[in-house]
Amino acid sequence: KKSWPFHNHHVSEEMFLILDGEGILRYGKNNYPLKKNDIIACPTGDRSVAHQIINDSDGDLKYLALGTKNAFDICEYPDSDKILTRGTSENNSELWNISKGKESYDYFEGEE
């Protein structure tokens, strides 16, 4: 059971406190066992700090998730090669864009 895909943030930091249960922290290229009272810090960075909490047990895995709520963030999803770009304005309107791969376009493409 997974709450979100394997990902890393370029702007927002996350921290998790395991309240109850057991599971696995997938972090970078490694897996680490999780148990009650563990604290996990997930800094910003490249795919080497990508992370995911996985409940591989038969019981519940309860945790508290804390994070910085920045107006802008870029998230990478290494397993699917997707990139999420998210921005929030002062009036809380949001713009999300999910793209795949590293395809890029000229600034004026399609604008003529």
PLM regions and their residue ranges:
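Conserved short histidine dyad/triad with adjacent acidic residue
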Residues: K1-H9
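Short coil/loop residues immediately preceding or within conserved phosphate-binding loops
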Residues: S3, E13, S48
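Short, conserved beta-strand element in jelly-roll/cupin
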Residues: H9-R26, L66-T68
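Short acidic-glycine-tyrosine-enriched beta hairpin
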Residues: M15, G28-G45
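Short hydrophobic/aromatic patches on the structural cores and recognition surfaces of FHA
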Residues: G21, N37, I53
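Short beta-strand His + acidic residue motifs that chelate non-heme Fe in jelly-roll/DSBH
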Residues: L25-R26, C42-P43, V49-S57
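Double-stranded beta-helix
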Residues: I54-E112
